[in-house]
């Protein structure tokens, strides 16, 4: 309970599971999934670096540098759980931040990497804290004058539809999809 906000505690009480991120001073940041099984508390944690690594540090193809600086479009990073989708997106946002001027708005559940403004103005919104749902945030994000929109994960058709519409209206949209192989993508 000490690591969770009152809203997260209520969500866990009501739904018996909750996702959130925590920072432990001197140790690091973690993405946490808290859940119940057979009446006991369980959790899974993943370490999140304090700063996003560069595309070069991740040894990702250099074409991603060009894609990250495009003026519009929809960029999907796909793969299985734990394959580096969020890390890759964070590196692309960092590349934009270092090499371009833009208004970037992220919608995440939870916020994982914390971005610091360099050349860009970056607003990071967390589902459940700063907005009710991905869909609600995406319906309103276009009024916030974004150049770049990052959607932490496309989980449903409403979010997918909103992502495509945002890209169609001239924005650069990044997101992730869980897939097991190329044909599923």
Regions inferred by a protein language model and the residue ranges of each:
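P-loop NTPase switch/communication element
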Residues: 65, 69, 75, 88-145, ...
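N-terminal "pre-motor" subdomain/linker immediately upstream of P-loop NTPase catalytic cores
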Residues: 1-80, 88
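Aromatic/hydrophobic pocket-lining residues that form π-stacking "cages" and hydrophobic walls in ligand
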Residues: 32, 92, 137, 162-163
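Conserved NTP-handling cores and scaffolds of large molecular machines
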Residues: 3-8, 38, 52-56, 71, ...
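Conserved glycine(s) of the Walker
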Residues: 84
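Conserved P-loop NTPase nucleotide-binding/switch module
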Residues: 110, 142-185
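Structural motif
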Residues: 78-80, 107, 125, 152, ...
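Switch II of P-loop NTPase G domains
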Residues: 53-57, 131-136, 157-159
